[in-house]
Every structure is written in structure tokens, then in C-alpha cells.
């Protein structure tokens, strides 16, 4: 990053610098393919036959040259899946290697302006508002929901649609990066990628692209979502009838998320001609990645107006149609919606209050609304089964790929996964699902060690004793056990219901992110 900042200082302001020459810098590809920095602890590093995880600058230059040649894509289409990893020559010409190499390297480059903006914005915030540091945690969204949602009536689950064509994503990026060669290279790459996949799968190009080029796709997609919200706020403030309200935007390198309150609806038949404001002072909006939640104290009809507005907004400004069914409207009470790895709902808790007046006493029945968050067990177990920690039914299995590691590394990996999950799900009011996940990971760790030593999991657990259990504890659980002495000393079997929202989490846990 220091070298990148030095380059940008030599070439002008961050908004007008040229990113294209960075494609020819060796350290860019070292950074792009450094699995120690970019991979998750939940997944094993991807190792390709004939590829040493380091991009040669000569290969990169050849790759850019071959992008403009038709025969590259002919070779890619003719390559079979069986020969994709068979050798360096076939692997170089495979479309998987082509797309991965270009997209990962290019995504690192286009993230540079946003990373610098993030650093500069955080420095300014620390000078002006020192207490705003806690708002960077995505867990700060849940106290916001606890404070605002319990007295509202309706909630709308919104899945922000993907643009039909990748060109929409490039056009959105033009407002952020003013480097014509880089944008031209990106557009040419996406165009060739679309033509290549048209031979294989019809009408699924953007889906295939999102699976094979996750980092670049999420960067482009979140740029588009950020642009949606920017235009949305701009239109809202454009009308003199709409009062200005507080809003906060949170920027991360490849994930954007925001939190706004008191948003006012703008219903438009034609955005270029007429603005018809509809005011709702009790509308709240939160979003993370492609999932947004709208909650209102208004009627069901008002929520339908919101849905109508959003459908027309995407149609007129981004030129694609969004199906209304992607925005479900439900009454907030006793309805559960999935958001950021939690199953959230507003519950009605009945209470009986005893009122004493002189010699007479009587009971008053009252209901209190309470915002509740729990862990969805079945989706999380399904996520664990995808990465081979357990079966689909939740039966723990060994991790063969980790059996060659040392005992310390195996225990450390499982312990980190368990602690990260516990840390992220510390806000759940019911911990039974979390205890089951810990049990699965602990037994999977024991079976992996038993597989390595050609022993049984029971014998290994008896030999290690409580030493293995302590690796799966978090600092929060040890703190709770100290503060609340009634709970058992081992949170794995405890029954405490205390919720803790962490203020140091800037992204969703990777295992949870698979089911969002």
C-alpha cells in the first residue's frame, strides 16, 4: 500500500490518476495472489497444478496481448474439464485461469482509490468525531434495530437485483474511476467473457461471472448498490418539500453498507418530469450487501408505494426491470426476517402488573414488544457441511485436507473458526444452536486429529482432556462466566441468554456469508 500511495502522489490526485500502468507492476500480482492475506481461515488455499500462486509479469503481458486475439477463446472453449488442470499449457489457455488471473489482479487495482478514500475518511472522522469509531462495526446495526423497530408496523424484505448486463456495472464505475484505459480493459474483458460463456450457458453470464470472479463481481456490484443509494438520497434532497435527515455511509474495501433513518418516499411516474413526494417520518432503512430492510409505522398501502417507487427507480435509472416479488411486505409483529446471519423478529411479551391502591389490589395485563435475534441453525449447519466439517444432517466428520498439518495448527484452525463464529453470534438471545455448532467443530477437530494419528476420537479426547475444550472458548464467554457466576464455567454447556454486540466487526463471518 505504501508503494501504491507513492505512485498515486506522482501521478496526481486520487480521482484522476491512471491505474492502467499498475497492471505491469510485479507487486500488484504478488498482492493479488497472496493467499495468506486474501484467503479465509475457513477454506483451504487453492493450489493449481502447474501454477505456483505467483503471477509472472511476462505471463501477464502475454495474457493482455492474447485478450485481443480470437484464438484464446477458441482454445478455452475446446478445453475439457478433465484437462483443465492437466498441465501448464492447457491450464494457461483454460478460461478459468484466464478469468481468475485478470479479475483478481484488476480488482486489486480498482480497489486502490476506494482504499485510499477509506483511510482518508477515517482519519478525518477521528479528528472530528472520535466517538464514531464504534459505528464502523456492522453489529451497530442491531442496536439501531432494537431501538427503532419494536414500535413499527410493517417490514419489507428487499433483495437488491443484479443488473441484467455487466455493462451497467462498468458504467456505474465510470463515476468513481476516471481512467479510460482501465475501464476499456475491464469492458473488453467482460465483453469477451460474455461471448465465451454464451457458448456454454445461455442467459446465465452474470451468475457464472459472480461465482468464478467473486472479488471483482462484488466490487462492481457494491459500487452499483452504492450508486443506487447515492441517487436515491439525491432525489430525496432535490425536492424542497423533503426535509434533510441524518444519514451515515460506511465504506469498506470491497463491501459497502449503510444505515439511514427517517427516509422519505418519492413516488414518480416519470423521474425526468414529475416528482411527487410522500412523507413518512417513521421509515427506517438498513442494508448489507444485496439485502435491505425497510420498516415503517405506516400502513400496508404506504409500503406498496415504496415498492412501486423502487421498481420504477431501477427501471428508469438503471434500465432494467425488477420483479415486485423481490420486495415482500409483512406485518412486523411475529414475523421473522433473515438479515446478516441472524433471524430477527419483534416478539410480544405479555406481562401482568400488580397495582396496589390503598386496600385494593388488581392485576393489569400488558404487552411489551421486544426485538429478538436468534441463530438460524439449519442454514448454518448446511454451511458447515459445504466446507466438509459435517454431513448435511449435522454429523461431525474429519477434515482430510488438514490431516497433514501439525497438531497445533489443526487445533488452532478449528479454535479460530469456533471463536470467530461465537464472536459474531454473541448477539443471539438463544445459545443452543451455537453450542451445537461448537460441538460439531470440536468433534470434527478430534476426528481430524484421530485420522492423523490413526486412533479414535474418544481415545484422543480422553488424552487431551479439557485442554482441547479451552481452545474453543472466546474472551466474551470467559468474561460472562466471570460476571455471571450462576452460569456454568464451561459456556459450551451453559444456558446464559445475555446478548453482546461487538464493536470491532467490519464484515460478516465467511461461513455465515454463504447463506446470506
Swiss-Prot record:
Keywords: Chloroplast, mRNA processing, Plastid, RNA-binding, tRNA processing. Disulfide bonds: none annotated. GO terms for cellular component: chloroplast. It is found in: Plastid, Chloroplast. Pfam families: Intron_maturas2, MatK_N. GO terms for biological process: mRNA processing; RNA splicing; tRNA processing. The keyword tRNA processing applies. One of its GO terms (molecular function) is RNA binding. The keyword Plastid applies. Usually encoded in the trnK tRNA gene intron. Probably assists in splicing its own and other chloroplast group II introns. Belongs to the intron maturase 2 family. MatK subfamily. This is Maturase K. It comes from Medeola virginiana. The gene is matK.
Amino acid at each position: 500500500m505504501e508503494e501504491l500511495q507513492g505512485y498515486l502522489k506522482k501521478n496526481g490526485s486520487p480521482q484522476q490518476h491512471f491505474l492502467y500502468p499498475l497492471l505491469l507492476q510485479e507487486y500488484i500480482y504478488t498482492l493479488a495472489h497472496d493467499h495468506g492475506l486474501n484467503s479465509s481461515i475457513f477454506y483451504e488455499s487453492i493450489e493449481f497444478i502447474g501454477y505456483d500462486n505467483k503471477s509472472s509479469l511476462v505471463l501477464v503481458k502475454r495474457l493482455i496481448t492474447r485478450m485481443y486475439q480470437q484464438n484464446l477463446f477458441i482454445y478455452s472453449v475446446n478445453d475439457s474439464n478433465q484437462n483443465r488442470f492437466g498441465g501448464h499449457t492447457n491450464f494457461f489457455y483454460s478460461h478459468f485461469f484466464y478469468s481468475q488471473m485478470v479479475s483478481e489482479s484488476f480488482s486489486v487495482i480498482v480497489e486502490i482509490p476506494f482504499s485510499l478514500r477509506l483511510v482518508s475518511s477515517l482519519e478525518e472522522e477521528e479528528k472530528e468525531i472520535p466517538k464514531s469509531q464504534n459505528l464502523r462495526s456492522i453489529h451497530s446495526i442491531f442496536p439501531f434495530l432494537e431501538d427503532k423497530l419494536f414500535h413499527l408496523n410493517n417490514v419489507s424484505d428487499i433483495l437488491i437485483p443484479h443488473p441484467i448486463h455487466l455493462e451497467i456495472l462498468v458504467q456505474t464505475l465510470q463515476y468513481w474511476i476516471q481512467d479510460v484505459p482501465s475501464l476499456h480493459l475491464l469492458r473488453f474483458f467482460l465483453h469477451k467473457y460474455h461471448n465465451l460463456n454464451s457458448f456454454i450457458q445461455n442467459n446465465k453470464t452474470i451468475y457464472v461471472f459472480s461465482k468464478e470472479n467473486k472479488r471483482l463481481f462484488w466490487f462492481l456490484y457494491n459500487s452499483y448498490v452504492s450508486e443506487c443509494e447515492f441517487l436515491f438520497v439525491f432525489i430525496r434532497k432535490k425536492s424542497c418539500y423533503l426535509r434533510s435527515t441524518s444519514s451515515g455511509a460506511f465504506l469498506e474495501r470491497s463491501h459497502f453498507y449503510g444505515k439511514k433513518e427517517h427516509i422519505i418516499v418519492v413516488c414518480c411516474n416519470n423521474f425526468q418530469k414529475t416528482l411527487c413526494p410522500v412523507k413518512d417520518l417513521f421509515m427506517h432503512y438498513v442494508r448489507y450487501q444485496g439485502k435491505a430492510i425497510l420498516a415503517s409505522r405506516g400502513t400496508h398501502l404506504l409500503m406498496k408505494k415504496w415498492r412501486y417507487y423502487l421498481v420504477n427507480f431501477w427501471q428508469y435509472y438503471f434500465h432494467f426491470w425488477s420483479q415486485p416479488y423481490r420486495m415482500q411486505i409483512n406485518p412486523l409483529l411475529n414475523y421473522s426476517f433473515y438479515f446478516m446471519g441472524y433471524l430477527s423478529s419483534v416478539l410480544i411479551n405479555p406481562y401482568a402488573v400488580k397495582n396496589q391502591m390503598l386496600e385494593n389490589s388488581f392485576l393489569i395485563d400488558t404487552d411489551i414488544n421486544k426485538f429478538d435475534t436468534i441463530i438460524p441453525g439449519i442454514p448454518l449447519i448446511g454451511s458447515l457441511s459445504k466446507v466438509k466439517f459435517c454431513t448435511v444432517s449435522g454429523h461431525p466428520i474429519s477434515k482430510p485436507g488438514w490431516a497433514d498439518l501439525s497438531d497445533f495448527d489443526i487445533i488452532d484452525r478449528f479454535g479460530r473458526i469456533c471463536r470467530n463464529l461465537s464472536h459474531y453470534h454473541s448477539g443471539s438471545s438463544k445459545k443452543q444452536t451455537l453450542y451445537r455448532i461448537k460441538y460439531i467443530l470440536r468433534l470434527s477437530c478430534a476426528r481430524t486429529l484421530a485420522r492423523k494419528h490413526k486412533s479414535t476420537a474418544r481415545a484422543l479426547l480422553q488424552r487431551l482432556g479439557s485442554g482441547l475444550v479451552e481452545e474453543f472458548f472466546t474472551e466474551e464467554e470467559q468474561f460472562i462466566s466471570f460476571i455471571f457466576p450462576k452460569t456454568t464455567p464451561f459456556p459450551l454447556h451453559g444456558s446464559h441468554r445475555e446478548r453482546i454486540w461487538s464493536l470491532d466487526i467490519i464484515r460478516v463471518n465467511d461461513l455465515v456469508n454463504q447463506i446470506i
